[in-house]
Amino acid sequence: MRSGWNEVRSIAEEQWGLVTKRQIEKTGIAWSTVSRQVGIGGLERVAHGVYRLRGGAEPEHLALRAAWLQLAPEAAVWERRPEQGVVSHRSAAHLYGIGHLAADSHEFTLPRRKQTRREDVWLHRGDVGDCWVQLRGLPVTKPSRIAADLLAGHEDPG
């Protein structure tokens, strides 16, 4: 099982120390082993189905990163496409430091309808096309798109 944990560590190294339940399951590690690691402090549950390997520094924007990983829990960061979710609206503005809007929820835009049970996650339906960039390791809408999204939602981006 050591090779399974090596694979989990390798995935987590590329994902800010985070790994999803589905990614762990792909390695063949038994869920009882994962539960034991949570119990002894080797893993920390940061969101439903998202865990952080202990020992490293906590990544900035941890909750946002965990929410983004939940959108496509089987896919590693390097395998993801914009169709699987792009940080947008207030969350994107917060990452850029634009405006004074509270980023008290995590907002993402996806081309297809998707639902979440999380009350702090808002999923917007739309096609971002090429109006996104990588920012701090996350796909994030460009400032011009942020302004358009916020104005369409009757928010003052200023």
For every predicted segment, state its role.
Residues 1-158:
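Short gly/ser-rich loop at a beta-strand->alpha-helix junction or flexible surface loop bordering the NTP-binding
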